[in-house]
Every structure is written in C-alpha cells, then in structure tokens.
Amino acid sequence: TLALIGSPVAHAIEPRYLLAIGLLLIAIGAGGIKPCVSTNVGDQFGETNRHLLTRVFNWFYFSINAGSFASTLLIPWLLDPYKAELGGFIAKLPPAIVGFLESPRLHSPDVAFGLPGVFMAIATIIFWMGRKKFVHIPPVGLRTYAREIFNKETGKIILNILIPVPFIAIFWALWQQNFSSWIVQAESMDRHLFGIEWLSSQIQTVNPIFILIMLPLFSYWLYPFVERFVRLTPLRKIGAGLFVTAASFFLVAIIQTQIDGGARPSIIWQVWAFVILTAGETLVSPTHLEFSYTQGPVKLKSLIMCTYLFAISLGNQFTAAVNFFIQNPDGSVKLQGASYFMFFVWVMLGTAVLFAIVTPFYKGRTYLQDQTQVAADAEPAVGFAVQPEA
C-alpha cells in the first residue's frame, strides 16, 4: 500500500489515505506476527535446554536488527534522488550500472516501500517451507483459552507480569526519539563522516550496527563475567539498562547545549550517544522478550508476549502526551533545546530508581513448555513451572 504512494493510484486516492491504510495494515500484521514469532522461538526450548533461552532471544533480536540495519540504510537512499560523485567508486562502474543506480524510477516510494514487501513475501514462503522443521504447539481451542484468561489465578499472574511494563514504557519513550528528535538535532550538526555527507535520517543506521556487535558481546562475554560477582536476573539487566539510557540522553542534552550556543558539533558525538543508547537497548529489549515469555502461562504465551508491544505503545503515547502539553497557545513550547532532552533524562532517572525499589518485591515463576509435549509435538502443551528467576 505504501508503495502505491508514488504510483498513478495516488492520483485516484489521496496519499494520506494510502499512508493511513498502509500503517493500519502494518499495525495489524505486526500485532499478529510479533507475539507469535517470539513465542514460537521460546517454544523450541524446554527444561533440558532452558539455559539457552537468554542467548536465543538475543539472537532473535539480532535477526530483527539485521533487517533494521538494511532498511534504515537502503530506504532513505531509495527515497532521495541520487547522483554518483565524480571520481567516486560508483562513477567508475560501467555506464549501464551507473545509469541504473541514478535512475529516477529506482529512487521512488514504490521501489523504496515495495522492495521490503517483496522480501517479506519471500521470507513468508521460506518460513512455510520449513514448517516441519520446528516444534509446533497446537492451539488449545477457544473454550480452554477463555477458561485460562478468566481464571482468577491467571489474572493474578498477568497483573504480576504487567508490573515492569510502565517502567519499560519510559525506556521506549526515550529510545523511539532516535527516529524524531535525534534526527532533528542531526540537521544542526556537521554530518561529514568518513568522507561522506550523511543524511540526518541515516545516522540512526549505527543503532542496528551497534546492536549486531553488542548482542553477542554481552551474551558471550559481559553477562558471564558479571555473573561471577552478581546474580544477573532479567529484572536486574532491565534496571541497569534504564540507567544507561538516561546517560545517552544526558549526552544528547550536552550536544544540544552546544547547538543552542551557536556551535555545529560533529555528528560523531551523536554516534557516541547511540553507543550508550544501544547498550541500554541491549540490556532492556531482548531481556523483556525473554522475561515475558518465561513468566507467561504456557497456554497464554502469545498473549503475554503482547505486553512487550504494549510497553512500546505506552512509551509512544507518553512522548506524544509530553509534546502535546508543552505546546503554548501562541505556538511556542515550554521545553525546547537542551531543556527538552534534560526533561527526559530526569524522567528516566526517576523511573530507573523507582524500578530498582519496586522489582525486589516481584514474585514470579518461570513457565516452560513440557519437555515431553515438545518432543511429541502432538498434544496441547500442559507446561510446568519452576521457581522464581526474575
């Protein structure tokens, strides 16, 4: 649908309606796919290999960011007109290739948004072809599902799992701003880096790059090292990530102070802020996926995984509410420049401190698929619980 914005169809339907339809379909697709995909990942593990869950969710998040890296680098390039620099590597290629890369037809919304759709279709086909290679947990049926949801004990479990969500939502309120306020800030910075003038929207490409580096680094080195001295539970990782995220916004606030003073700092400073932000993301995001999966009752895994998306949604709503309430009637804003970023620093610090106070009282249980059921791959999983790990 988004690809049609640059096509003749846009003359018959207003682009804003096409955009709204495309976003609605993305929301429906993401809401259906994401909780089920992450649940399917966890369902491959039972009691005998439960120690691998942390790493597998890290690798799952790794694969997500590999796609994010490709899209954030490629889509802005496909949306903008392109002209090869004289004397550059591209200009030295055969004329036919240069002509193709510079073609206005290539650099258009229908290609920029249509190409990911093609890749999504290919991925769907490959996934379907490999459906017999992984464990399936059969649906329990509507009656059983309803009985589980409206069970008093299940209600207590769900409410318990929701405790960290508001805190993690504030993390997402900050993190998502690398797509908005950080891009606006980059417009006022010197974006020459490695001999290239980067688009302000391309700087965020470093985030998935750093994620691809940090996920295995944290999983195979940092976490085992810290475990020698401190028991590193999921909630402790998340708490540490909240403090780290506040530090990233503090650096961005310092950068903005320089900009407000008339300076034009190098974009490398924002890259360093991305290093810190990505470290916080590595601690919080895949850990929340793992936490949500392990704490959810076996018949409600996909539903519980929705709490991950719920936290992201709450974070976006919080930022939108802040941006609404800081508006003055005359069009000015109460928070601008460095003060805007410092507001989020203090909010994040307060959230992190409160999280550290609340979470020691969290009493959870780890629920995994019954190993015999996973091996048989036949009956609805009955599951079992082991003692608290969160």
Q: What do these predicted ranges mean?
A:
Residues 45-54, 58, 63, 75-205, ...:
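Intracellular loop-helix junctions on the cytosolic face of multi-pass helical membrane proteins
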Residues 1-19, 240-262:
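C-terminal ends and interior cores of transmembrane alpha-helices
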Residues 58-66, 205, 209, 243, ...:
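Transmembrane alpha-helical cores of Major Facilitator Superfamily
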Residues 5-8, 66-81, 85-89, 250-253, ...:
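A gly/Pro-rich, aromatic-decorated transmembrane alpha-helix motif that marks the paired
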Residues 23-28, 168, 172, 208, ...:
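Helical-face signature of the major facilitator-like transporter fold
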Residues 1-36, 40-44, 78-83, 108-130:
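Hydrophobic or amphipathic alpha-helical targeting/insertion segments
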Residues 54-59, 198-201, 239, 271, ...:
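Conserved glycine-rich helix-kink/hinge and helix-boundary motifs of the Major Facilitator Superfamily
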Residues 32-47, 274, 281-296:
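Intracellular juxtamembrane helix-capping segments at the cytosolic ends
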